[in-house]
Amino acid sequence: MAKKSDRKKLIDQLDKLSKQLIYQRDNYTCQHCGKNDGRDYQASHVIPVSAGMKLRWDLQNMKVLCYHCHLNWWHKNPLEASDWFNRTFPDRAKYLEENRGIYKFTEAELEELKADYTEQLKNNTHRF
């Protein structure tokens, strides 16, 4: 098996850190149905990663959904889900609309983001 590149390792670490921050921010609670049983929650992107990396780790672009709401509602009813997000989080929706686009992070930027997220988790100081 091929060894992971340093960039791929950073990407994996940032995925993990951003999920941890989102779980904490949203109190391990599905933002759609309110389920809070400590299991089956997922970090979900508003603007999909496939639309570009610019917002992949932007915490404003993420929310916690339970497994059911993520797969059976968010992905199957994108218009309804988008309307819900815009009504529920209008400031975040506006921010995302203004900041979407294609962007390629440098390795230094990835390292800086990783350090910032690690520090936020360590000190329980979130800047959402």
PLM regions with names:
Residues 49, 84, 99:
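Short acidic/histidine-centered micro-motifs embedded in hydrophobic/aromatic stretches
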Residues 1-17, 36-37, 95-128:
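A boundary/linker detector
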Residues 31-64, 73:
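Histidine-centered nuclease catalytic patch
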